[in-house]
Amino acid sequence: MSEKDLKKGTTTLGLVCKDGIVMATEMRATMGNLIGHKTTQKLFRISDNMALTVAGLVGDAQMLARWLSAEVKLYELKHGTKMSLRAASTLMANIMNGRRYMPFWVQLLLGGNDSEGSHIYSLDAAGGSIPDQFQTTGSGSPFVYGVLEDRFKENLSLTEGKKLGVRALTAAMKRDSASGDGISMCVIDSNGFQKVSPKEIEKIETTLAA
């Protein structure tokens, strides 16, 4: 199968804020020079306290999201408690490392809250797992990092985090041809996973453009 036949995701980000995390993606999937889809899901709810963003092959990404979601649910049923972000990150890293010679063509961000606080982990195709205060993946990540390095600060409010996420992804969509077609975003705080509505994202975009 040639590169032009493969549907690939592109730009995602995650931010650790004072009261939780913000995760966001754009929605374009490309097949070589062709825009394959304009409403691609790259942000997955794994559990009430955990979410995953994906960049890379859509098929690999969707399968890994289903796999992790099932493992987390089984853990909760067996142990009667939520899986920690560190444990989920280690599990996902081990799965990916086991395929390092025939790797999944993805880069993942795993984020959420647990008893130890808020976390964002970046996971690569070889099984590397790195926590940080902010992370980005995909072809538009250089543009996102430019914005985040300049504007991110510790203890951002979730409102500030949502605005920064929209600003950073907008910068990527303006310059990276493989990124575009809108933004999907969630927050995870003490109330659990919450999807940010398209109307709220549009309002933030309007405010930033003013």
Residue ranges of predicted features:
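Long, low-complexity N-terminal extensions
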Residues: 1-210
